[in-house]
UniProtKB/Swiss-Prot annotation:
Domain ABC transporter: from-to ranges: 2-241
Keywords on record: Amino-acid transport, ATP-binding, Cell inner membrane, Cell membrane, Membrane, Nucleotide-binding, Translocase, Transport
Function of the molecule: Part of the ABC transporter complex MetNIQ involved in methionine import. Responsible for energy coupling to the transport system.
Organism of this sequence: Xanthomonas euvesicatoria pv. vesicatoria (strain 85-10) (Xanthomonas campestris pv. vesicatoria)
Chief localization: membrane
GO cellular component terms given for this protein: plasma membrane
Catalysed reaction, written as an equation: L-methionine(out) + ATP + H2O = L-methionine(in) + ADP + phosphate + H(+); D-methionine(out) + ATP + H2O = D-methionine(in) + ADP + phosphate + H(+)
Protein name as it appears in the record: Methionine import ATP-binding protein MetN
Subcellular location: Cell inner membrane
EC numbers: 7.4.2.11
The keyword Nucleotide-binding appears for this protein: yes
Membrane topology annotation: Peripheral membrane protein
Alphabetized InterPro entries for the sequence: AAA+_ATPase, ABC_transporter-like_ATP-bd, ABC_transporter-like_CS, ACT-like_dom_sf, MetN_ABC, MetN_ABC_transporter-like, NIL_domain, P-loop_NTPase
Length: 335
């Protein structure tokens, strides 16, 4: 368990106090994949670097288990950092070392015997699919391969927590998907707690269990990804979701003016996503429908669908009640 208790961070610049992170309270459970999303300058990198004390807090407490991280120094802080791995946006590999040498580096610093290092490096390179690239140098690798080296290196000391600082931002979409699949596999197989920061809601949707949304250094929304993604409350969260779904809300509302009837947003979650609910209820209630927008996708392993439809004719109240009875979440956009 990682607990932030009124943790905050400020800087002094030319005599002015700059607040990077306002006091916040947050809990991240053991074994979770927890996402932190925000635009540039929102405070997300500051927050994640407070966990391993790469940033020093200005106040508040940070607990990992029962240990107060904010009170550690010297040997205690070094021991903490061995339990926390970290991967970076631009990989931070040593160009003069081979792939195997980069993965071995933290073990060498820890004084691990050579035979143990060699065995651990071989194990990790197999896990990330790079066993055939052990003797190559970073300049000979693709971006995705470099990030896999970064992941293997971060796992070398058998950490309990893995911090991912914009780990896919420098990668193309296909490579991003493969790296996210690898992180999800590591979470499942090793039970690691993963804290991932990003500015892309699609990354959150694919791999995270819960998410926190930061805006201008403030925690503005948090909860399960299914709830936050499908029913965003804060304006910043709604913008992230619209960007992920490639929806122009202003254009969509202009489309509303061109159609008549009652407009509703229908949200299907789980196996019900694939049930023919809309057609059945239309037949039962005599309602006609016009689909204005639609999407079927997955949030991590859970299928979901969202439709915005205009209902005309028939018994629209009965249709709405029928959707609710079928487990569909209904939001009235225009009655």
């Amino acid at each position: 368990m990682i607990q932030f208790q009124r943790l905050h961070k400020s800087y002094s610049v030319d005599g002015r106090q700059i607040v990077a992170l306002h006091p916040l309270d947050l809990r991240i459970g053991p074994g979770e994949v927890f996402g932190i999303i925000g635009h540039s300058g929102a405070g997300k990198s500051t927050l994640i670097r407070l966990i391993n004390r790469l940033e020093e807090p200005s106040g508040g407490r940070l607990l990992i288990g029962d240990e107060d991280v904010t009170a550690l120094d010297g040997q205690g802080l070094r021991a903490l950092r061995r339990r926390i791995g970290m991967i970076f946006q631009h990989f931070n590999l040593l160009s003069s070392r081979t792939v195997a040498g980069n993965v071995a580096f933290p073990l060498e610093l820890a004084g691990t015997p050579r035979a143990e290092i060699d065995a651990r490096v071989a194990e990790l390179l197999a896990r990330v699919g790079l066993q055939e690239h052990a003797n190559k140098y970073p300049a000979q690798l693709s971006g995705g391969q470099k990030q896999r080296v970064g992941i293997a290196r971060a796992l070398a000391t058998r950490p309990q927590i893995l911090l991912c600082d914009e780990a896919t931002s420098a990668l193309d979409p296909q490579t991003t998907a493969s790296v996210l699949q690898l992180l999800a596999q590591i979470n499942r197989e090793l039970g690691l707690t993963i804290v991932l920061i990003t500015h892309e809601m699609d990354v959150i949707r694919r791999v995270c269990d819960r998410v926190a949304v930061l805006d201008a250094g403030k925690l503005v929304e948090t909860g399960p990804v299914t709830e936050v993604f499908l029913h965003p409350k804060h304006a910043t969260t709604r913008r992230f979701v619209s960007e992920a779904e490639h929806v122009d809300e202003a254009e969509l509302h202009r489309d509303f003016a061109a159609v008549g009837g009652r407009i509703v947003r229908l949200t299907f979650l789980g196996n019900g996503t694939y049930e023919p609910v809309l057609g059945r209820i239309a037949r039962e209630t005599g309602v006609d429908y016009n689909i204005l927008s639609g999407r079927v996708d997955r949030i991590k392993d859970t299928p979901y669908g969202q439709l915005i439809v205009a209902l005309t004719g028939g018994d629209q109240n009965a249709a709405r009640a029928g959707f609710v009875a079928a487990g569909v979440q209904v939001e009235d956009l225009r009655v």
